[in-house]
Amino acid sequence: MIQLKVYAGLSTLATLVVIYHAFSSRGQFYPATVYLSTSKINLVVLLNMGLVLMLSLWNLVKIVFLGSLREAEVERLNEQAWRELMEILFAITIFRQDFSVGFISLVVTLLLIKGLHWMAQKRVEYIETTPSVTLLSHVRIVSFMVFLLILDCLLTYSSIQQLIQSRKASMSVFFTFEYMILATTTVSIIVKYAFYVTDMLKEGQWEGKPVYTFYLELVRDLLHLSMYLCFFLMIFMNYGLPLHLIRELYETFRNFKIRVTDYLRYRKITSNMNDRFPDATPEELSSNDATCIICREEMTSAKKLVCGHLFHVHCLRSWLERQNTCPTCRALVVPAENATSTASGNRGPHQESLQQGTGTSSSDGQGSSVSAAASENMSRHEARFQAAASAASIYGRSIVYPSSANTLVWSQGNSLLPQTEVEAQRRFLESQIEVLTNQLRLLEKPTTVDTKGKSVADTA
């Protein structure tokens, strides 16, 4: 702030000196203005004064609507400003035939308006994460967003009018596209803020807020991607390859692809939550911590994940919109399809007999509880069992496994390898399969829970 005041004071002093020299040396108004507009030094000083006036107006708007900036907002502003400046310099090279003082003024105006949008977005994010916000802060941010939306609409309308009058792809296309992007971004910020206010009025109990926010961001990214594609094709057909749009186009496409993938995954998981995730029993709620780790509130009813952790159904639904893992242990909420198919394909006779025994003993009341404990005990070793079975099946199909079916393949494909290396590989794999076989034997031994289950079933 102090540096801006010093810079503005020196620029004002230089401008006054230049104007005084022009009128004192020329004596009349018209010769003095011609001298000021034709002299390069005078023109640079006057343009610098115009930049000072724009920065002063920008700073005034910031003070009125936002007040003092936080450190995170200043950091965001500096990062975005340098990146946007490089992209604008690339854009200037495309529209070099339209390069003039007016074009530079419009570019500086665009950069300053983008800075206001960045600060508005960051301030809304800060308000959403702050527990107590004053009424004045809400009024200022709402007024600021409405001001930005009106400004975006006016500048978009002006750029479209210039584009219609010129009837060709010129710098008006660039500014029209930029202000349309800013307008859609401002609308999305306003709607997102409205969602926040609605949730605040409902005391944080609006379960539909994450869903509507997700749809809003999906539609916003779709609109941005469509506009980027149209502008890219228009510039490419009239001027050449727009280098400054490649990064924005790629990031927008990547964000849209990620959101569509997350949406499909979310719909797949939440389509049958009641069937996929069972309800927690009162015994499970009493034996475990009955506090939901997502909302930090007590649970009277909850859903149980595969890993055994309990959560509110609406908290779990909100969490699954962003993550596919358990909030507590980071295990996958839904196992991968390839792991499931591998486990089903490598299911051994012992596992099938164990499932049959469990199903037989479930007819009795006590036998059902014991079989449930046995299945829970088996689930703890299921991952190791699947890994061992998969490794055994892979080893059996490999060329190292000694069988008559793969002798020819081994001799043809590895005839050039030294015998010492072949023997070392064979001994290593044989030791690994021996370890896996021992693990399988340990898993096949009946545990204490299984023995009790069998005795209870026999007694019944």
Swiss-Prot record:
Residues 25-40, 120-140, 192-225 are lumenal. The chain crosses the membrane at residues 4-24, 41-61, 99-119, 141-161, 171-191, 226-246. Pathway: Protein modification; protein ubiquitination. GO terms for cellular component: endoplasmic reticulum membrane. PROSITE patterns: ZF_RING_2. Probable component of the HRD1 ubiquitin ligase complex that mediates the rapid degradation of misfolded endoplasmic reticulum (ER) proteins, a process called ER-associated degradation (ERAD). Targets the misfolded LRR receptor kinase BRI1. Functions redundantly with HRD3A. This is ERAD-associated E3 ubiquitin-protein ligase HRD1B. It comes from Arabidopsis thaliana.
